Amino acid sequence: MTNIRKTHPLLKIVNSSFVDLPAPSSLSSWWNFGSLLGICLGVQILTGLFLAMHYTSDTATAFNSVTHICRDVNYGWLLRYLHANGASMFFICLYLHVGRGLYYGSYTYSETWNIGILLLFAVMATAFMGYVPPWGQMSFWGATVITNLLSAIPYIGTDLVQWIWGGFSVDKATLTRFFAFHFLLPFIVTALVMVHLLFLHETGSNNPTGIPSDPDMIPFHPYYTIKDILGFLVMLTALATLVLFSPDLLGDPDNYIPANPSTTPPHIKPEWYFLFAYAILRSIPNKLGGVLALVMSILILAIVPILHTSKQRSMMFRPLSQCLFWLLVAVLFTLTWIGGQPVEHPYIIIGQTASVLYFLIILFLMPMTSMVENYLLKW
């Protein structure tokens, strides 16, 4: 008798995706982050759902409802901090996942890569909107500053900003719609994840060598299920440690002050995972130029497949490209640091230098280095 998991209309989809899926035998721990992102998404949706049961999206009561969740709801503090720090873990895994794709040339699967970029934008939008509901000082001013950037769009900018705000400033209407979208977007993200996996399973996984692995495949279960479970344990231990020992480590103290439109915080800055893009935005004195640079800092990933000039897919055997890749990582760390600093000397010039380097490495240095490596291969 044939196993039910191979014949049942629903189970056979699960079976072909997570059990009998042929996977390359050489996958390293860098391939764990896809499943870790799935766990993060699950944790965020569950904790968010329970938080939404006690939260009120009204400017008069929003801040107090979050306080009520932390003080009066059973394990409400745990839900709140799991949700806030879960977002940080989500972005850590997300950036490592994208970095893995860049290093090992996974971007040559263009459909999977482009859906991934859409996912990145969707998750960033979700996280930005999720920063507003606590209705603290940084929630209010962060929303005001970032949405106000859209006013740089010629002709329609001002109308667009007022349309998003639902008035002439960030107020009750803005909070309500941001909360509604913050609730809705994770489900759209889940749908996009399924499309992402669909395209991935059309081609099969890449591997560290970048060489086709068709002759040497192993079943996903039990080999990679066990490997993924180890990843889950490591990540959930890190998340639990963060939540239980220093839940406010990555947050902003200003968000414990209720939103006040008449008092501006000394340093308006987004959450740490947006600081690199914020630094690129601030490094350009022109408003429209800054907004374009901000969008391009992420959208540049879409042209990475076009810029691939190497005869090898992966960077595993390309030491010159490896040096550039790790320089890019250092530049991103520098931008993240600069994004959290005040706009004054010497931070301005450091931020501008790092921003130029970021685009220079991706657009020019990496393709040129790949061509040099191709030439060296002839020797």
UniProtKB/Swiss-Prot annotation:
Lineage: superkingdom: Eukaryota
Q: State its cofactor.
A: heme b
One cellular component term from this protein's GO annotations in UniProt: mitochondrial inner membrane
> Where, per UniProt, does this protein localize?
Mitochondrion inner membrane
Positions binding a ubiquinone in this chain are H201
InterPro entries in alphabetical order? Cyt_b/b6_C, Cyt_b/b6_C_sf, Cyt_b/b6_N, Cytb/b6-like_sf, Cytochrome_b, Cytochrome_b_C_euk/bac, Cytochrome_b_N_euk/bac, Di-haem_cyt_TM
What GO molecular-function term can you cite, just one? Answer: ubiquinol-cytochrome-c reductase activity
For this UniProt record, give its keywords in alphabetical order, as a comma-separated list.
Electron transport, Heme, Iron, Membrane, Metal-binding, Mitochondrion, Mitochondrion inner membrane, Respiratory chain, Transmembrane, Transmembrane helix, Transport, Ubiquinone
In terms of PROSITE patterns, this protein maps to: CYTB_CTER, CYTB_NTER
- Enumerate the transmembrane spans: 33-53, 77-98, 113-133, 178-198, 226-246, 288-308, 320-340, 347-367
Annotated heme b b562 binding sites: H83, H182
Q: Tell me which residues bind heme b b566.
A: H97, H196
- Record keyword Metal-binding present: yes
Q: How is the cofactor bound?
A: Binds 2 heme b groups non-covalently.
> Which BP terms from GO are recorded?
mitochondrial electron transport, ubiquinol to cytochrome c
Topology in the lipid bilayer is annotated as:
Multi-pass membrane protein
Share any extra remarks: Heme 1 (or BL or b562) is low-potential and absorbs at about 562 nm, and heme 2 (or BH or b566) is high-potential and absorbs at about 566 nm.
User: What subunit structure does UniProt give?
Assistant: The cytochrome bc1 complex contains 11 subunits: 3 respiratory subunits (MT-CYB, CYC1 and UQCRFS1), 2 core proteins (UQCRC1 and UQCRC2) and 6 low-molecular weight proteins (UQCRH/QCR6, UQCRB/QCR7, UQCRQ/QCR8, UQCR10/QCR9, UQCR11/QCR10 and a cleavage product of UQCRFS1). This cytochrome bc1 complex then forms a dimer.
Question: What family does this chain come from, according to its entry?
Answer: Belongs to the cytochrome b family.
The record's function comment reads: Component of the ubiquinol-cytochrome c reductase complex (complex III or cytochrome b-c1 complex) that is part of the mitochondrial respiratory chain. The b-c1 complex mediates electron transfer from ubiquinol to cytochrome c. Contributes to the generation of a proton gradient across the mitochondrial membrane that is then used for ATP synthesis.
Query: Can you say what this protein is called?
Result: Cytochrome b
